Amino acid sequence: MQPMTHNPGAEAVAAQVIANAARGLAGGTTASAAVTALVPAGADEVSALAAVAFASEGVEALAANAFAQEELTRAGAAFAEIAGIYNAVDAANAATM
């Protein structure tokens, strides 16, 4: 039988994943103003339509980014919870020995 171990540093990694997701979400929020407020290159209809199309695609990309960052936050929280459970069980078992 192989020995089973758990690295207590997993909680720190989970916290880093959550922090990275928060930074990614903040970056997307910051970028939203620049992406949606693009000024057309010229006064013609094509430039106006291109600016609208770019803004529309940008909004979709920002929504996908927000969803991805929320998923990373949930994953980091799950890792933190699991690591906390492992650490608590290990500490309890060590105290009984």
Curated annotation (Swiss-Prot):
Disruption phenotype: Increases efficiency of DNA conjugation when disrupted in donor strain. Disulfide bonds: none annotated. Part of the ESX-1 / type VII specialized secretion system (T7SS), which exports several proteins including EsxA and EsxB. Plays a role in DNA conjugation, in at least a donor strain. Belongs to the mycobacterial PE family. DNA conjugation in M.smegmatis is unidirectional with distinct donor and recipient strains; mc(2)155 is a donor strain while MKD8 is a recipient strain. Mutations in a donor strain that alter DNA transfer do not always alter DNA transfer in a recipient strain. This is Uncharacterized PE family protein PE35. It comes from Mycolicibacterium smegmatis (strain ATCC 700084 / mc(2)155) (Mycobacterium smegmatis). The gene is PE35.
